[in-house]
Amino acid sequence: MRTYLRHAWCVVLTVAAFAQDEVVASAVAHAQAHPEGDVSASFVAADYRRDLRDLPIGVFDSGVGGLTVLEAIKAHDRHDNRTGKEGADGVPDFAGERFVYFGDQANMPYGNYSAVGRTDFLRELILRDVLFLLGRRYVHGQKPPVKAIVIACNTATAYGLEDIRAAVKAWGLPVIVVGVVEAGAQGLAETADGAQGGVAVLATVGTCASNAYPKALAKVTARPVRQLGSATLAAAIEGDPSVQTPIRDIIRADVGAFLKSAAADKAAPIDTLMLGCTHYPLVADEIVAAFAYWRDHESDGRKPYAALVASELKQVNPAAWTAEALRRSLQGSKMMAVKPSSAGDLFYISVPNPAWPGVGLAADGSLTYEYKYGRQPNQVGREDTINVPMTPEKLPGATAKLVREKLPLTWRSLQGVR
């Protein structure tokens, strides 16, 4: 049975400098050795020596959380499509674009790799995600390459953004790369509306350990920042069978531990929540409710956390700001689609490959905890997981319900996947 690290209300780990040379060099060399894109984690080099404008946009996450980012992109309408000027025109800014989504569900949650000393392996996983999007090959046939990559995962952005940019540069590809962390920080800066209180960054343990949000936020605000890292919430939202605790109870326990620590440290009152995991917008109401629960909680005739939580909490969802960053990058590079796509979006997820020698499988067919977190990097082409189409039927029931109710544009696109 898999076990997960307990929630961490604040992570104070210092992440060592990433060994960019070895991990990135291995992925770069692997792809360069296979310019025909005929093996795992490779792409057809010739695909990127032509006009890329009508290629799809690639979006990836460790699971289904990135669908919240895809939804924000598909709904984004901040500009007139005819003139390109600021101002909504009733037509989504990306109406003419097609998307390829990939969720690395077999290897999630990404947030726990750093805590068990597997940061370099996580970085390799992230580069493999990128190579899948860039390439054509998948287990059942072929898919189109992509002209842009959106890292719709905070942990993957924190640990992989610079690696991806370095690899894309080494391959000589004119591919746009956008991450969610800087976009989230910019979103907070542009929507502060006079808020002066503390910012609570809600994320995975791995994202907290990277310190990516405090660093990014320090560039745009002097407001105090405190992190709440959860090791199980993203997995619970995914419907991971090893996480039996109800989502509401996980959130309530995480927030309670976070506020207990904040009270002990005499931290600044919190008035803004940064949804620093792409899964969390799916349960944003439950998160706000948990803060309200503890704000009003009485113990020994007093409310110990009332002064720590504002009566109204502002939420910052980096997804919408990621959409705007993507639009600006595509527009600035003259890479917006020329011909509106009539083809549907494509969705893929990873699943364990039982045919891979030595793969460790649990009774439910997932990777065992020991195998998943025991792997080492420098095997970019390994296929202990394979990528297959994501269909509504492949989503756990509770997850499918969240997507159907809260991400209608994405759910509609998913209906066409078979």
Model feature map: region roles:
Residues 2-10:
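Sec-dependent signal peptide recognition
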Residues 9-12, 186:
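N-terminal low-hydrophobic presequence detector
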Residues 11-19:
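Hydrophobic h-region of N-terminal signal peptides that target proteins for export
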Residues 20-418:
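Non-catalytic structural scaffold of enzyme domains
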